[in-house]
Amino acid sequence: MRRLTCARDQFYRVVACACLKESLQQDVSTAIQLRMTNSSDQSAVLLTTLGWSAFFDEQLEPGDAELVPMRIATVHRDRVTAMSELGPVRLKLSAQTNTTDFAVGDWVLVAREDRLLVRRLNRRMQLQRKTEGRRQAQLIAANVDALFIVTSCNEDFNPARLERYLALANEAGAVPVIVLTKIDQTPDPASYFKQAQALQLGLDVVMLNAKAPDAALTLARWCGPGQTVALVGSSGVGKSTLLNMLSEKSCANAQPTGSIRAGDAKGRHTTTSRSLHAIAGGGWVIDTPGVRTLHVSDVSAGLNTLFAEIVVLASHCRFRDCTHVHEPGCAVQAAAADGTL
């Protein structure tokens, strides 16, 4: 009887130890899973802050599990840097990599160990322009939400050039915003505002003095967490000053700003390459060098948006092939004559 009791007690002890061991294993497993989940959630939040979205997430494949998503911050002839969850990283490039295939704002997958750039994800949109002497269009930026078309309230203000930028933004699918700078240096900034607003239906136009304390609030709606804007415009219009204001850079880290010539108000180049910068409000801004001559091509959709009023009126012309110059029954000419266009 005593032997039976001892055997039974020993059996219970073994079962109890086994249950305790299993319980401990479950606790450890739960803790590890919780830790991994929290880490994953934190990673997702950081990627979203960088501009990551479902569009890029859907491009990931099972074999990409060991690769790290990063966002291109600068592109040079022989090197590429990217923004990661831990900050800026210089990427390792293979011998076959052509840096002209990449644009600031691109999302790429990078090997975790050696930081080798493995592949670029498809772009949600891209900004590009034609350059003289080149067959291939030049990439300006990628995966941009809004395009800040910067011009100053002086001799630089050029409606024809602004229209080309608007066509560029419309074609790419970016929200165009005309930013009128240096309003403190003109007696009549309202006249510039009126001219800019008339360029396109529903166009957002803002006026600001980039050095004013509340200047950033004027642009806040386009600069929230995860949003990306690009700055374009001529040299000397205040893009670098605007960049410093948006990123709240200290004097030591600020982008150099240039003066303008007194004779024609044309500026000197202070930005020499495209680059991605964090906005104080949580978004990102892509700075671009000043462009004095902008060529656009293959932007038919962008032009239709730019001249939406004319497109609508043209459908009411008497003749389908109306050139809107001399034909009778031209709705465009009639609208121009009575002041509605």
Model-flagged regions — what are they?
Residues 9-12, 16-159:
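N-terminal accessory targeting/assembly segments
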Residues 31-41, 63-66, 100-114, 120-146, ...:
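Helix-rich effector regions associated with P-loop NTPase G domains
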Residues 140, 150-201:
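Phosphate-binding glycine-rich loops and their immediate beta-loop-alpha structural context
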Residues 185-235:
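Canonical P-loop GTPase G-domain recognition
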Residues 239:
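Conserved lysine of the Walker
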